[in-house]
Structure formats: C-alpha cells, structure tokens
Regions:
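Conserved N-terminal helical subregion
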Residues: 1-94, 137-150, 182
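Short, surface-exposed charged micro-motifs
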Residues: 40, 116-118, 186
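Conserved mid-domain beta->alpha element of the FAD-binding
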Residues: 64-65, 93, 151, 171-257, ...
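Histidine-centered metal-chelating micro-motifs
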Residues: 71, 92-94, 114-118, 201-202
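Short helix-loop capping/hinge motifs at secondary-structure junctions, enriched
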Residues: 99-105, 137-138, 162, 187, ...
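Active-site substrate-recognition segment that forms the wall
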Residues: 106-138, 149, 153-158
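Flavin-binding catalytic cores
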Residues: 141-175, 241-242, 246
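C-terminal domain-closing interface element
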Residues: 258-282
Length: 283
C-alpha cells in the first residue's frame, strides 16, 4: 500500500526463504528433479519430449520455461538470447555478506557519474551491489569470477567512501554474482506446447525491483488462463499473453524511465536531481 507521502510500503522476503516456502507448498504434489536440466526438446501435436543433460528422456503435455534471464528453454525453443535481450548499458556485481555493514533494515547508496554502490542490511546480512555504465556490451567468461571481480575493481578502486572495504568484502564472499543489466522482450511467450514465465519471458531488470513479483504474478496469470481453457492450451497461452502483457510492458517502461535515473544516474546533474527527489520523501 502507499503511505500519505506516496511511498509504497511492502514486505521483502529473502530469496532462499521464498524458495523454501514455495517448495513446501508443492513438494507433496509435484515431482521435483534436482541437479538436472534440459538439453533438447521435440514437440508433436500431443506432447513435448525433452532430453535432460543426464541423458534421460521424458514426455510431458506442456513445457513451461521458468529458468531465468539466460533461459535454456528459451534458447532451445525460441532462439539466441541476443534476439530478445535489451542491453541497458550497465553491469552489476552482487555479494551478500553475513554481517551488518550498516544499521539493520537500512540502505545506503554511493554515486559518482556512471557508477553506483548500494548497501542493503537485513537479518544480520548485507547486500553489496556495484554497478557501472558501459556503452557497449563486454565480452567476458561467465565462469571466471576472478575476471568479473577484476572488472569491478578496475571501475571502483580509485573511488573514495568505503569502496576499499567493500571490495575486500566482495573478494572474500562465496556468492558473488555478475551480469549485464538487461530486459527480456518477446513478441510471444509461447511456441506450440512451450511457454515461458518470469525473467525468461519478461525480465524487467534489477532496476525495476520487481523480478520475483512478476514471476509470481505471471505464474498466477498463466494458471488462471489454463483454468479458463482447460482443454485448449493454445487459447490458454493467448489469454496469458493478453491479460499479463500490459503489466509487464508498464513495469519494463518504468524501469527504463524512472529506475535507471533513480539507481544509476550517469551525470552529476542527474545525481543532484535524484537527491532532490529523495529529499522530498518522508520515511
């Protein structure tokens, strides 16, 4: 809900906690396969047959790809990621440390033009996020964490504030994640008996702060559509697109128009403009 000052109040649930909650709800009724993924698929009029990386083959009525921004299901069924990825000219590195670097339940942000550091403290943990502007996409090894950390260091090591301390914390953590800031935009979220949900279909980027929420809302929209058309998956997929696409397009547009200026201003003027807006908000 919104407060009198227009600030939206919400509850934030840690990713691991949310996953445990969801798994607890479905574990008695859903077969869950760990440590395996799809390597290929074949569709017929009656079913989808998939081959797993383990070599096993299984057939299903429908295949729903909920496997994130770099979706394997999307690549196999729809084509290369580059056809659907909108690069937002920023890269980010995220680390989570098991201690408080600022007061609990608070956040801090450091900005210079084209560079942002954000701290978010909760439950005796602190998220450390580094983000930097890049006009072009950067070629790097997605498996080489040291190379990715070096890119963060090269962009931030000469900055002041607490940067040296935070870079050391980043180097010591065992959960570092690095990626480009991007959105996934597709003309269609389904092909035959395959449909995509969440970031795989309509990632809004971290600038939106809505990835998890959109995945849950999208799953609910798809479930509603399948319930509405239980005997016709084609109509169900069309209904899913019709009902949920306006929401995804609005959130993605807001991330571009407002989220980037809020979190990653590129000029000193943009930083001052953002700070002035913060100054008018009462907490």
């Amino acid at each position: 809900r919104e407060t009198a000052q227009g600030v939206t109040e919400s509850y934030e649930v840690e990713r691991d906690v949310l996953l445990d909650m969801l798994f607890h709800e479905v574990k008695e009724n859903v077969e869950v396969i760990f440590n395996d993924s799809i390597s290929s698929l074949e569709q017929s009029a009656e079913e989808v047959t998939v081959t797993f990386t383990s070599g096993k083959r299984r057939s299903f009525s429908l295949l729903l790809g909920c496997d994130g921004t770099h979706s394997v299901v999307r690549k196999i069924c729809f084509g290369e990621e580059s056809s659907f990825s909108l690069f937002m000219q920023n890269y980010f590195g995220l680390s989570i440390v098991d201690k408080l670097l600022i007061a609990e339940d608070t956040g801090q942000m450091f900005n210079v033009p084209g560079k942002t550091v954000m701290l978010n403290a909760y439950n005796n943990k602190t998220d450390i996020a580094f983000c930097f502007f890049s006009e072009e996409e950067i070629a790097y090894d997605q498996r080489d964490l040291n190379q990715q950390m070096d890119m963060i260091r090269q962009h931030f090591e000469r900055e002041g504030w607490r940067i040296s301390e935070l870079l050391e914390e980043m180097a010591r953590c065992n959960n570092f994640y690095f990626d480009k800031l991007c959105q996934i935009r597709m003309d269609s979220w389904s092909k035959g008996r395959v449909a995509l949900v969440g970031d795989a279909a309509y990632c809004p980027s971290p600038a939106a702060g809505m990835g998890g929420s959109m995945a849950i809302l999208g799953a609910a929209a798809l479930a509603d559509a399948l319930r509405k058309y239980p005997n016709d998956f084609k109509l169900a997929f069309q209904e899913y697109d019709r009902s949920f696409r306006p929401i995804t397009e609005q959130i993605q547009a807001n991330a571009i128009e407002f989220g980037m200026e809020l979190v990653m201003p590129r000029t000193e003027e943009a930083i001052q403009r953002r700070n002035a807006q913060f100054g008018t908000v009462e907490r």
